[in-house]
Structure formats: structure tokens, C-alpha cells
Design a protein with these regions (language model features):
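FAD-binding core/adjacent interface of flavoenzyme oxidoreductases
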Residues: 1-5, 60-143, 219-221, 230-234, ...
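Beta1-alpha1 glycine-rich phosphate/pyrophosphate-binding loop at the start
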Residues: 2-72, 159-180
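Mid-to-C-terminal Rossmann-like scaffold of FAD/NAD(P)H-dependent oxidoreductases
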Residues: 2-3, 274-371
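Residue-level detector of alpha-helix initiation sites
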Residues: 10-14, 36, 109-111, 128, ...
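A Rossmann-like FAD-binding core segment of flavoenzymes
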Residues: 26, 74-83, 87-91, 98, ...
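FAD-site-proximal beta/loop scaffold in flavoenzymes
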Residues: 119-141, 213-219, 224-294
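Rossmann-like NAD(P)H-binding beta-loop-alpha module
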Residues: 132-181
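A short, polar/charged loop-to-alpha-helix boundary motif
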Residues: 371-388
Length: 390
């Protein structure tokens, strides 16, 4: 391959560039990013950056020395608008066309918005999003309504509460994170909200947003109305695949690819939040750093030589606690606390470790403020999973 183009200049795109050079690719390397910034770390946006404990210069994932060493052409602040797979060209929004022999799709995802939501309803996905919300939060005490009790919603609510704002979280399900963690551990997350001084309203949705110039209230399906100065939505993300419409790639909640991140076209792979690898779109920091290794191996080989089905892992920092989860939860799994304790459906002072069991086997582990026991349990889970697939 004479030219490889990476579309997407965030975490997965950067790791793909590193892997290409690490695996010996010495041809032309082009990285296209729709944001004007070099790659930056997104997890702190809802936490330390929002609260002012971290500034923008601490978010950088790379520096000038590494960028020079990668010998890549960085085309930042320009969006890809199309892909011609027959001509092997990437069409850019500024009118330029890039001819490429290999393509890494790493375009990530965009925060999902409420239908018809006005511009002053905040999301938190990009640095621009975080800048805008941080500026609003420094204007003085505000009544904040967070729509969505997932990880982004919970982390954002915790940060707003830490800054002294009056915060309410709305979650349509009976408990936050119920599909991801199951009822026992979802109840723990609910307790963290309560302990953090945040009101949690579950089991109801949003019917409309009341405005008087800007948003002033959130109207709920149960008939109640919440007064709000700031409204934030954390209701998931949509993979950035619109630019691939009309290409020969198969799309469906992401770019469909095998467990080696290879698409049906040998010269195209996908990584990160946009990749639906082996039937799953992982959407986690760890996946974005691990997938590029096998993707690049297969891209350079022109066929799938390497596959990876790691045990899913994610973490979340909220209300001064770190939640870590590894594995695959399924409704009906038995959950046992094996270290530490639960007090009133919340973590004890020293945290806890819980195991999810199915048919006598551990299939997932969750810890709150127990990093070392969790690391051991995660390794054990990984060994078990590897044995099961050999």
C-alpha cells in the first residue's frame, strides 16, 4: 500500500496511526478529522474538565514530538462527506478528494439529541460541548436537569452537583443503567445519586421542553414539570456513518465488520465507536485502544488474519467513586458480593466486588472502589473466556 487514510482523528484514529507505523507501514499516512483539535481524551470532559480541575492542555493524547514521528498528514477541521469504494477515494467537505489504497474508518459517534431540542439544550461529547457547558456552570448556582441516567448523564450530574448546582436526573427506566448492570447493581448506582445530593426520577420520559427565549422547564410524561435553568441530554450516541451512504459498505448501527474489524472490502477496516465488530458496537475507551492492533494487521494483510473478542470492560467515575465492570451481563444472572459490603443498597466505606454468575460460572465482575481485587477478577475472567474459545 502506498497510501493509507484514517478518517477520524480521535482516540481510535490515533491508535490506528501508531499501529500502522509500529507494524512496519512506511508509506503515506493521512489522518482526517472533523474537529479542529489534535486527538484529545474524552472521558475527562464530563468530570475533571467540567469541574475545572483539568484544563485543555491536559487533554492532549499526543504531542508535537510523537506527531512528527508518525510522519502523518493531519487534515483537521475538515469532514469526510463520501466514499467511492470503486475509485478508492475519500471525498472531503471542502471539495478535496483523497485517493487511498487502504482506509481505516474511525469516525466515532455523535451525541443523540432529543427530537426538536433547541440549541441551548446541552450534550457532552466534544470539547466544544464541554466548553459551552462549563461556561454556563460558572455563571452561578443553577437548576440543572440531566435527561438520561447512563454513564455520561451520571458523571455530568455528579460534576454539576460538585459545583454546587441543584441537580435532577431523569431516567425512563425503573433504575439507571438497568440494561447494562442488572437490577442489583443498578440500585447501587441509584444510591450513589441519592448520596451525592442529586434527585433521581425514574420511570418517566420527557414530553416537551418549555421555553421563554431559552429552556425554562422540562415537562414529563407523568404530568409533572421540572423548572430548569440548564438542560443536558445524555441519551446515547449515533455512529457517524452518514458519509458512507451510497458506498458498498454494509451499515447498521455502525460499520459492519468481523471480529478482526475487517469489512467485506479487504482494503477497509473500522475501529472505535463506529465499528460494529462481530455484531457488537463496544463504545468504550478500552475497545478504541485495542481494536486498532488487529484491524491494522488485517488491513496490511488484505484479509482477516487476526481476530479479537476481548472481555468487555468499562469504568465510570461519579460522586467520588470509581465503578468498574468487565464481562457480559444477561438478565437472570445471579449477583453475589464477594468482597466488601453493601449498606442500604450502596457501597460500604471500603467499596465492594460483585460477581455475576450463570450456570455456575462467573460471567462478569463489578467493583466500586476496589481496583486491585477487580483487576485480579478481570484477569481471571479473561483467562476463563480465552479457554472457552480455544
Amino acid at each position: 500500500m502506498r497510501t493509507v487514510t484514517i478518517v477520524g482523528a480521535s482516540l481510535a484514529g490515533l491508535y490506528a496511526a501508531r499501529e500502522l507505523r509500529a507494524q512496519g507501514y512506511d508509506g503515506r499516512l493521512v489522518v482526517v478529522g472533523d474537529e479542529p483539535h489534535p486527538p484529545y481524551d474524552r472521558p475527562p470532559l464530563s468530570k475533571d474538565f467540567l469541574t475545572g480541575r483539568t484544563d485543555e492542555d491536559r487533554l492532549a493524547l499526543t504531542d508535537a514530538e510523537e506527531s512528527a514521528g508518525l510522519e502523518a498528514e493531519w487534515l483537521l477541521g475538515v469532514r469526510a462527506r463520501g466514499l467511492d469504494t470503486q475509485a478508492r477515494t475519500v471525498l472531503l467537505a471542502d471539495g478535496r478528494t483523497l485517493t487511498t489504497d487502504g482506509l481505516v474508518i474511525a469516525t466515532g459517534a455523535t451525541a443523540r439529541r432529543l427530537p426538536g431540542a433547541p440549541a441551548d439544550v446541552h450534550t457532552l461529547r466534544t470539547l466544544e460541548d464541554a466548553r459551552a457547558l462549563r461556561a454556563r456552570l460558572t455563571e452561578g448556582p443553577r437548576r440543572v436537569v440531566v435527561i438520561g441516567g447512563g454513564f455520561i448523564g451520571a458523571e455530568t450530574a455528579a460534576s454539576c452537583a460538585a459545583l454546587g448546582h441543584d441537580v435532577t436526573v431523569l431516567e425512563a427506566a425503573p433504575l439507571p443503567l438497568l440494561p447494562r448492570l442488572g437490577p442489583e447493581m443498578a440500585a447501587v448506582c441509584a444510591t450513589l445519586h441519592h448520596r451525592g445530593g442529586v434527585r433521581l426520577r425514574t420511570g418517566t420520559g420527557v414530553t416537551s421542553l418549555r421555553r421563554t427565549g431559552s429552556v425554562t422547564a422540562v415537562e414529563l410524561a407523568d404530568g409533572h414539570t421540572l423548572t430548569a435553568d440548564i438542560v443536558i441530554t445524555g441519551i446515547g450516541a449515533v455512529p457517524n456513518t452518514a458519509w458512507l451512504a451510497g458506498s458498498t459498505l454494509t451499515l447498521g448501527d455502525g460499520v459492519l465488520c468481523d471480529e478482526g474489524c475487517a469489512t467485506a472490502l479487504p482494503q477497509v477496516v473500522a475501529v472505535g465507536d463506529v465499528a460494529r465488530a462481530g455484531g457488537t458496537r463496544a463504545e468504550h475507551w478500552t475497545s478504541a485502544t485495542e481494536q486498532p492492533r488487529v484491524a491494522v494487521t488485517n488491513l496490511l494483510a488484505g484479509r482477516t488474519l487476526a481476530t479479537s473478542r476481548p472481555v468487555p470492560y468499562f469504568w465510570s467515575d461519579q460522586y467520588g467513586s470509581r465503578i468498574q465492570f468487565a464481562g457480559r451481563y444477561r438478565a437472570g444472572d445471579t449477583v453475589r458480593v464477594t468482597e466488601g459490603e453493601l449498606l442500604d443498597e450502596g457501597p460500604g466505606e471500603a467499596g465492594f466486588l460483585a460477581r455475576y454468575e450463570r450456570d455456575g460460572h462467573t460471567v462478569a465482575v463489578l467493583a466500586v472502589d476496589r481496583p486491585r481485587p477487580f483487576t485480579r477478577a478481570r484477569r481471571e475472567l479473561g483467562r476463563t473466556a480465552a479457554t472457552a474459545t480455544t
